[in-house]
Amino acid sequence: MTNFESVGKFMETFGQEVKTKPEIPDAKTVELRIELISEELEELWDACKDKDIVSIADALTDILYVTYGAGHAFGIDLDACFEEVQNSNMSKLGSDGKPIFNDKGKVLKGPNYFKPDLSKYIK
């Protein structure tokens, strides 16, 4: 069972809707999902400021959890989307097969980069 599937099981067990078709949920659900993600991002920021690695691990895991929950609330298969984005990200290598970075360390797009096509999962 993937992490995404595990969160779906949690949501079903606790009476939360798990959509099987992509769609925008009602405003209350959208607001809840955004608030949950925002809260966990704030916890990560606080943990980083405190240099508390255990709290950082907790916040990062919670960010994944609530993001997977949002995927289910919107009926988006995040496992499939992740695989598509992963393949796209791996296409960012330079023509010499090496990564290209900007001055902040961000990986840049190489000549063989292709944009992920998430539309095929939103049907």
Question: Where on the chain are the PLM-derived regions?
Answer:
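Flexible "arm" and connector segments at domain edges
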Residues: 1-60, 64-123
